[in-house]
A protein has these predicted regions:
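Short, leucine-enriched amphipathic alpha-helices that occur as contiguous helical runs
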Residues: 13-20, 48
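DNA-recognition alpha helix
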Residues: 32-43
């Protein structure tokens, strides 16, 4: 596999939490629409099972809260999640400057 392909996989499907926290930072997102939203905004279509796993872990660790929106499961990024997202952005900025 070419290096760019490995890199693309690691920063997309390998780090779904970044995309979930980003999408849910301003509005609640329904679980069933997350794949489509990620595809529309970030250009890749993640596996549904991976999304469920990431949501479970993010909720368990307090990075997202689980809500009901129109009777369906939805998620919103918590303050803890926003801080984690800001830390990731800072890390990426520093890394890009070093490259």
């Amino acid at each position: 596999m070419e290096p760019i392909k490995r890199f693309t996989n690691s920063v997309s499907e390998g780090n779904l939490w970044i995309y979930v926290l980003s999408l849910a930072k301003e509005v609640e997102i329904q679980e069933e629409t997350i794949s489509r939203l990620i595809f529309e905004k970030f250009g890749f279509l993640p596996n549904e099972l991976m999304i469920k796993t990431v949501l479970f872990r993010l909720k368990k660790d307090g990075y997202v809260s689980k809500e009901k929106l129109a009777g369906k499961k939805s998620y919103k990024t918590t303050e803890k999640g926003l801080k984690e997202l800001d830390s990731m952005k800072s890390y990426c900025s520093n890394l890009i400057q070093k490259l």
